[in-house]
């Protein structure tokens, strides 16, 4: 017995030693670079221009509804007036009536270009909430150190930030070695099927193959990573897919005084409950696992130990992360019942009821896998079909070992000293889904600091962006272009 206990004790000590060695020898994957000091931005003037853009109600509507044409055309004219050097130096094309494509030719046209993306459209303001806004949603008010209004954060901060950065570089006499492309969509919030899709098709027809693409997406997480005081630039290297499934239940209709054992509403409600109680399995892989790999070396030892030893602690880490919606969404295909229809009067039984359940699909899963899961979970008697035409598969994962990702890390370190950077899985969708065939290196990042409370404002009430943070975003875009497209001065005339 004593011998057995001794062997067990030695085994435990060896295990602890292995765990501690793995945790204590993790190498940092951060990039350290000298801070940039020669990119002065007039924060107040830049904020005024962003505020002006917010005042245009460029609301995108579902397919089949009219575009807010005048608002987009007015915004186009505003951008032209606000950034005169951009519009004198770059070529601008209007795509699909309202999207914009800019080209800044490089003096080495044989180099693959870079593509910076964002979108000009915004989601509607929820009817009835207008009075809950501190400042009217399309006022573009500047107050308390913030620019307020719908689209300030999603995503006019990127559209204007990119243009401000390019305007700054032109003013400094910068000439890109490689071509710089800017693509601003007009219907991202409803899938990008007209604007972004048309722009991607146009670039493909021209044989354009960008070295890398950057769109909106991950943010600078401020106070949102447990164990880390430093803000973290969450650079999304992949995004989830999307599908909404329509569930249909049928039963006998008639008067509520003589109901069947199960009404159509009861059947569809039970189906939704089964889906909520039986989510698709969690996995720690892909971009989420890489995020842990980048952040674990920066954590205190106690927090680092389980992440450095997922071979042992993965089940426990999954249980811990599944307790919070945000972290749970990084590990699994999520299930969200969003709409239900089944009644017209309190004493009338309809013969049919429907529910719509939205799934954000984890890379490694698929639309087909979601449908199979739904059918097996809700059981027979419930109709299952894909709703609408916005279904999309998860994106491929862009590699963090590529020079393009390191370029983003370097720019973060130069513009935001002391900030960490890590890959990330984006739970939402972006216009990049239409551009995936153009480049294997696709990233999603907005260089603006955000707290957990700020996230609720995006698509919600009191959307805003800090004047100071916006100036930082302008510097980031300018430095990113310098890093990616800079080089020796172009040769002079012979």
Residue ranges and their predicted role:
Residues 12-150, 171-176:
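Acidic/His- and Gly-rich active-site-bordering loop/insert found
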Residues 60-61, 109, 120-123, 187-191, ...:
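Solvent-exposed loop/turn segments at secondary-structure junctions
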